[in-house]
Amino acid sequence: MAMHLGINDVVVTSKRDIISRPDMGGNISLSVDALNDMPRLGGAVDVIKLLQYTPGVAATQEGNTAMYVRGGDAGQSLVLLDGAPLYSPSHMLGFFSVLNTPHLSGLTLYKSGIPAEYGSSTSAITAIRTRRYMAKEFGIEANIGLIESDAAVELPIGKHLTLFASARHSYTQWLTSLLSDNTAIDYDFGDYGLGFVADLGSAGELSFNTHFNNDDAKADVFIYNSICTLRWWNALSTLSLRSELSPRTTMSNTLYGSIYDNRLNLAIATTNSHVRAGVADYGFKSVTNINLTDVTIDVGINYAYRRVRPQDIMLDTPNNSDRQHIENSSEAALFGSIHWPLHEHINIKAGLRLSLFANDHVWFYPEPRITVEVPVSSALRFWASYNFMTQYLQLVPQSNMSFATDFYLLSSEHTPPQLSHNLSLGYIHEALDGRLRWSAEAYYRYMLNVIEYDSRILEVIAGGTNHEAMLHSGRGESYGLETSIGYSDRAVDLHLNYTLSRSLRQFDAINSGNPFPANSDRKHNISLLTSYKPSPHWTLSATFVYATGAPYTETTALYIGGNAFLREYGPYNGSKLPDLHHLDISATYWFHSRHFERSGLNISIYNVYARRNPLMVSWSIEDNGTDKLYLRERHHIIYTIIPSISWTVKF
């Protein structure tokens, strides 16, 4: 099935497109129902991982599913589930997101031409939608595999109520046992969802959705005689009422709550350290859509009360005073937008968002948005867009992994709101009745008040580290060219993307005030996604990704000073990890059965040629046997080749 995206809606046609063509502004939409032919790596289809095979989304190191969109940092991309923020969308190791795909209906990635109703992000918005329809009969979709198993249920109750439920549980012990010879890791995760849709007749449609996921990990590091335990979780709920006020006017009101919490306990010798961080959002959003003859208008309001625990450090040592601090804030916005087909060959979508943030300080910013589309013909169109975005909640990363040591900070006098100016210009051309298409989009982003953190978790635990003293506020820019070519018919679906880009940062107190590559900088990024159905029984698919290695700061020398090692560093982020690349393949045999709507056996191999893609680099002093010490660089590998087998059934 193929998806062709209009301005506001996805239209499903008879072709098999996995990824829709870009809409007005170059954004991307995915429909879960069209993903059956996608590679089932690890036995499951993951919509968040799929986004890494779309233009402008950089491939990350192994162990990381962070969204680096157009040179933005991980914390500059916001993920929304039915309108509620999902602050930690990845499980540890980066192999899965926290979302159970059968519970979803689709998503849209906004990276330019961002509607005025969305804010709180300076890079990109990923709006994910759960299933909302009245089911006609009871149904189950399940996947049983070696790494994880999941199931989703839909249950109609009468004609006006449908329940949806989903669950996923992992079997990762055999996988984590392969990660290190010096570390014993016990790791588990789970994802759970529950929702309903009720038809209230003339009063409208009421929907509810709740999501919970958790990660539990324990690591015994033998060489350091230490035990580390981690637990982090998301819990969010949304309640929405959609009402038709008139044949041309609809209103949607949503209440939501979202909580993210992470906890790290580290026991080394006789010292126990406890680190806790989190964020809680409680909000309301109302959007009114007015559909006139030729013009569509959206207006609305958004309010969020937010509580943030930046990072509590508690040590089980004598005379220790625990550091506990919780910050509160309010964020409100008024927004409006208009879609106006000014001429047969000119479409305009313009909007304005007025955002207000208050804690110890008050900030107010108008955020203009405009996109102009020029459809030259049904097969060729151009567009240009400008967005001004603000972000008041800031993520402070402390790890390259999808890990529980990152934390959030509210904007303050020392860390003012992040701002970004975003420009883009693109086109798309289609041929062969839409089966073949190619597109290109150039972008430029200028960022103010971006942050860089000069400490790591062990330094924080050691005590005496003041977060604000280790934070630097500066500016950045990113620019690039995204190109894509795709072909789809009833048997073949192929998408090839290439992005040439740079992302730079500049801080007065770092690198002598000179610009340096951002952590998200990837000069070259290539992705390939292909699927082939030689017969109704078989689906063969493959993905390939290549990206320039991530930047890091090299240790050039170690000195012994007193009772500690002193480091000498090279240029800040002046070195790069080896380039990342891997090929993944998947084969599914679909059985014909009178008892099941769909039943298939899948075999997949992640990283077929066992490429050793490093997560990070460390250094150690070693003896070369001649009574001389030398500095050794070590590349840490999480995993290489991962085979999996699973059975999928739907009835």
Language-model features, listed with the residues they occupy:
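Short acidic/polar hinge/loop motifs at secondary-structure boundaries
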Residues: 37-39, 84-111, 187
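Short, acidic, small-residue-rich periplasmic hinge/interaction motif at the N-terminus
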Residues: 1-39, 48, 74, 244, ...
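Gram-negative outer-membrane beta-barrel transporters
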Residues: 444-446, 467-556
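Outer membrane beta-barrel strand-and-loop segments of large Gram-negative receptors
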Residues: 281-287, 323-335, 412, 416, ...
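Extracytoplasmic beta-strand/coil segments of soluble accessory domains associated
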Residues: 39-43, 48-85, 105
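Surface-exposed extracellular loop regions of Gram-negative outer-membrane beta-barrel proteins
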Residues: 261, 309-314, 360, 378-423, ...
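A beta-strand signature from Gram-negative outer-membrane beta-barrel systems
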Residues: 53-54, 98-141, 150-152
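C-terminal beta-signal and adjacent terminal beta-strands/loops
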Residues: 537, 546-563, 580-582, 588-651
